[in-house]
C-alpha cells in the first residue's frame, strides 16, 4: 500500500518507509501511535506494551512524553496476554508486529498501515515529522550457539562480562542476554547512545 502524496509505503508486517527512505520500525510505530492516543486522551492506562527487545531510545522518548510502558518477553503472544490482563489497547514488537487490541489479537500489517495513515491525516504531518522526538539508539545483536542455554547464561565468566558491560554503559545504554525460544542460541543485544562503547 503506498501513499503517493507523501511518497511513503507500508508493507507486510507493518514495515514502513518514510518519504526520505528511512525504515520505520515497530518501535517508531509504537511511539507515533502511543503519542497520538495519549494526545487524544485514549491511551488506556497510559501504557504502551513492548517487549524487552524494544529500543532504549523508545523508553527515553516515552519518559519525555509522560507515556508509561510495559515490557514483556519476546513474542506477540506475550504482548497480547499483557494487554488483555491489563486493559491496554496498543502494543507490539520492534519487528513490526503491532497489536491494536480493539480490532485484533495479533499484528496485522494492513491495520497498522491504516492506523499510521489515520495519524498522518489527523496531524497533517509526514512520517518523518511524526517520528520527531524519538532517537533510536544503535543496537547490536549477536547470537552465540551453545549446547546448554541455561548453563551458558549462568556461567560466572559470562555473568562477570555482562556486568562489566552494564556498568560501563550506566544509564546511557543496556545489555540484554536471553535464550532463543526456537534455537540452541543465546542472544546478546547491546545498545548505547553511540556505536562505540
Write out the residue ranges for each language-model feature.
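Single conserved hydrophobic/aromatic residue that forms the stacking wall/gate
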Residues: 1-7, 11
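Residue-level "hotspot" positions that anchor or transmit function at local structural transition points
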Residues: 2, 22-25, 104
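Short Gly/Thr/Asp-enriched flexible loops that form oxyanion-binding sites at enzyme active sites
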Residues: 13-29
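Phosphate-binding and adjacent anionic-ligand microenvironments
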Residues: 17, 40-197
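Structural motif
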Residues: 28-44
